[in-house]
Amino acid sequence: MKTFVAKPETVKRDWYVVDATGKTLGRLGHELARRLRGKHKAEYTPHVDTGDYIVVINAEKVAVTGNKETDKLYYWHTGYVGGIKQATFKEMIARRPEAVIEIAVKGMLPKGPLGRAMFRKLKVYAGSEHNHAAQQPQVLDI
C-alpha cells in the first residue's frame, strides 16, 4: 500500500465563518492555524496547502486572559532611524482589531511561500458583517 499524497488541484476547500466573540486569542488562533493548514483532514500532506478558507467576524470582541490586555505589547518598525513603535493589546484592539488575530495566526503558520499561501485564506473582520456570503460559509464553532 502506498502513502497517499494530496495534489493541489484535487484538494477540496470549504469556507467557514467563526465568531470570535469572547474566545481566547491563543486558543482561537491555534484552531484557525490548524484548519488553515489542513491538519484536521485525513488527506493532510505537509508540503501541500490542504486547508480551508476561514472568515473571522467580531475580531474586536476577542478576549485575553490575565493582565494581557495592558501587559501584552506589539512592536513594529517604521523603517526610519529610531522608528521602533509599540502598542498594548488594548490600543491595538481600538486601532485595528483585525491585526491582533492576524498576527497571532501568522506566527503559528509555517514560514515561507506555503505559509503565506495558507495565511491568504484567512479573512478577518472587526464587526459582524463580511462580504463572503456568496461562498456560503458554514458556521464553525470553536
Swiss-Prot record:
* Any one cellular-component term (Gene Ontology): cytosolic large ribosomal subunit
Record keywords, A-Z = Ribonucleoprotein, Ribosomal protein
Q: Name one GO biological process term.
A: negative regulation of translation
Q: Which SUPFAM superfamilies match?
A: Ribosomal protein L13 (SSF52161)
Question: Could you list the residue ranges that cross the membrane?
Answer: none
Fetch the Pfam families from UniProt: Ribosomal_L13
Cite the CDD domains for this sequence: Ribosomal_L13
- Looking at the record's lineage, which domain of life comes first? Bacteria
Keyword Lyase among record annotations: no
Query: Can you provide one Gene Ontology molecular function annotated for this UniProt record?
Result: structural constituent of ribosome
Functional note? This protein is one of the early assembly proteins of the 50S ribosomal subunit, although it is not seen to bind rRNA by itself. It is important during the early stages of 50S assembly.
Under PANTHER family, the record lists: LARGE RIBOSOMAL SUBUNIT PROTEIN UL13M, RIBOSOMAL PROTEIN L13
Q: Which NCBIfam families match?
A: rplM_bact
Supply the HAMAP family for this chain: Ribosomal_uL13
Quaternary form? Part of the 50S ribosomal subunit.
Family according to the record: Belongs to the universal ribosomal protein uL13 family.
The name of this protein is Large ribosomal subunit protein uL13
Give the species.
Histophilus somni (Haemophilus somnus)
Recite the lineage of the species: Bacteria, Pseudomonadati, Pseudomonadota, Gammaproteobacteria, Pasteurellales
